[in-house]
Amino acid sequence: MKTKLNELLEFPCSFTYKVMGLAQPELVDQVVEVVQRHAPGDYNPQVKPSSKGNYHSVSITITATHIDQVETLYDELGNIEIVRMVL
């Protein structure tokens, strides 16, 4: 079932992505690079390691201007090779 985010959100709005991926140094840079392409800005992502240290979660908040931007970022963040999940 696909959630109708456009019915739940009023644009522009703050929107936080939580990206979980392998604990590799390039994860944060790759996430920020993708976000910059669709929502240019000055970002300070929060990074938290998993309990065993195999994965990192990267939380990054954008100012979303429309639903297409939100959906495109979900797709492109999920396409990063070392990313395992995007919430």
Swiss-Prot record:
SUPFAM superfamilies: YbeD/HP0495-like (SSF117991)
GO CC field: cytosol
Signal peptide (residue range): none
NCBIfam families according to UniProt: PRK04998.1
Stated family: Belongs to the UPF0250 family.
Protein name per its UniProtKB record: UPF0250 protein Spro_1197
Organism: Serratia proteamaculans (strain 568)
Taxonomic placement: Bacteria, Pseudomonadati, Pseudomonadota, Gammaproteobacteria, Enterobacterales
